[in-house]
Amino acid sequence: MGVPMAKNLINAGHEVTVWNRTSDAAKPVVDAGAALAATAAEACAASDVTFVMVSTPEAATAVANAAKDGLSAGKGYVDVSTVDAETSSAIAEIVRSTGAEFLEAPVSGSKKPAEDGALIFLCAGDETLYRRCSEPLETMGKAHFFLGDVGQGAKMKLVVNMIMGSMMTAFAEGLTLSEKCDLDPETLLQVISLGAIASPMFALKGPTMNAGAFPPAFPLKHQQKDMRLAIALADQLRQEMPVAAAANELYKRAARDGCDDEDFSAVIK
């Protein structure tokens, strides 16, 4: 996700400095014209605004701690990772302790929208930084929303991904049932596309699911992580989540069966 986002910034004329925990992963961005920093702090020191995209709450916290020595008053730190609200608040505290501003901006969208500059940013935190970031956000995405205090963006993203994950399990069950009924799966996709339940996700994922192919646009391990975090959020609020909880069990089973690094649509297995 971070690679196409950075490339879009470069293509729009921004000076970009990159750092990655795995140095080889930064090579495509360096080849596209970015400077390579030796450390996270060095990348922040070289940048007015730093965007961070990592895969887990633990990684997001570790990167913030590694980056803080490069932050200072006047700089901005935008974490676009999907984390829980508590982690985002902890990162905000780390960043703000340096005098820098913080914005959480988790994205709705996967690899293809990232490549196309069509992500949706769910932002919360320092509104002045949000306004400063409007141009790069528009370069990397098709929409961005300011949702208030730190934590609100994280919560919105978990709600969105919980809905997406639950929809996918229902879709997978429908495809499987149609196959067992000797119904043509391609006809099923056509019927769905013409009715009230038509969905871009179903149209995109249906053909590859029918073909048994699961190239990872959004890895299953990340979907299961987001289901877990959404269910934990609901537990805090004493909100029943029977559908999401049942869907999460299917993702956990798929992960145990070796589908962690396949697309989340591999839950159909």
PLM features: residue spans?
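NAD(P)+-binding Rossmann beta1-loop-alpha1 motif at the extreme N-terminus of oxidoreductases
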Residues: 1-52, 75, 111
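Hydrophobic residues within alpha-helices
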Residues: 5-9, 91, 136, 177
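Hydrophobic beta-strand scaffold residues
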Residues: 16, 36, 101-103, 144, ...
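Residues in the short beta-alpha loop(s) of Rossmann-like NAD(P)-binding domains
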Residues: 21-22, 56, 126
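Rossmann-fold NAD(P) dinucleotide-binding segment
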Residues: 40-101
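Rossmann-fold dinucleotide-binding core
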Residues: 77, 82-162
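Helical "substrate-binding/catalytic lid" subdomain
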Residues: 152-267
